[in-house]
UniProtKB/Swiss-Prot annotation:
Transmembrane segments: none annotated. It comes from the Bacteria. It is found in: Cytoplasm. This is 3-hydroxydecanoyl-[acyl-carrier-protein] dehydratase. Pathway: Lipid metabolism; fatty acid biosynthesis. The gene is fabA. The active site is at 71. NCBIfam families: fabA (TIGR01749), PRK05174.1 (NF003509). One of its GO terms (molecular function) is trans-2-decenoyl-acyl-carrier-protein isomerase activity. Its main location: cytoplasm. GO terms for biological process: unsaturated fatty acid biosynthetic process.
Length: 172
């Protein structure tokens, strides 16, 4: 049974990483340091730029986050690939929220632009995912556009984020 709410806490997201939120067949989020959000504040089946679904989530920033110590020494910045991964994570989370089953895998992105950075002095990163299409056949796949904001300023955009859910990933 899918635990379908409009918002989720960090505890809920950690439960997803253990496979407890969307049931045994639902796609888990990454756990530990690779979980790139602290809360989901909005999920809808409509809304967003394309009126086909919307997710908004947040990550609290503090100088003690693991990546600031190593990327880069003396010039700490959140790796842009982690923001991109967060957007893929949210596409997969949405597919599980809709009742999709399987293991989530990022399938690509059409275009990514970085126009800013996340520094340890920032307070909050906001992720916004605007769904364009969800395919629910043998393959369950989400197609979406995403935005990353730091303290309200748009710093990354991604067009055509693709995530699929797979029952068997052995041949992937």
């Amino acid at each position: 049974m899918v635990d379908k709410r409009e918002s989720y806490t960090k505890t809920d997201l950690e439960a997803s990483g253990r496979g407890e939120l969307f049931g045994a067949g639902g796609p888990p989020l990454p756990s530990g340091n690779m979980l790139m959000m602290d809360r989901v504040i909005k999920m809808t089946e409509d809304g967003g730029s394309h009126n086909k679904g919307y997710v908004e989530a947040e990550l609290d920033i503090n100088p003690d986050l693991w990546f600031f110590a190593c990327h880069f020494v003396g010039d700490p910045v959140m790796p842009g690939c982690l923001g991109l991964d967060a957007m893929w994570q949210l596409v997969g989370f949405y597919l599980g929220w809709l009742g999709g089953e399987g293991k989530g895998r990022a399938l690509g992105v059409g275009e990514v632009k970085f126009t800013g950075q996340v520094l340890p002095t920032a307070k909050k990163v906001t992720y916004r995912i605007h769904f364009k299409r969800v395919i629910n056949r043998k393959l369950i796949m989400g197609l979406a556009d995403g935005e990353v904001l730091v303290d309200g300023k748009l710093i990354y955009t991604a067009n055509d984020l693709k995530v699929g859910l797979f029952k068997d990933t052995s041949a992937f």
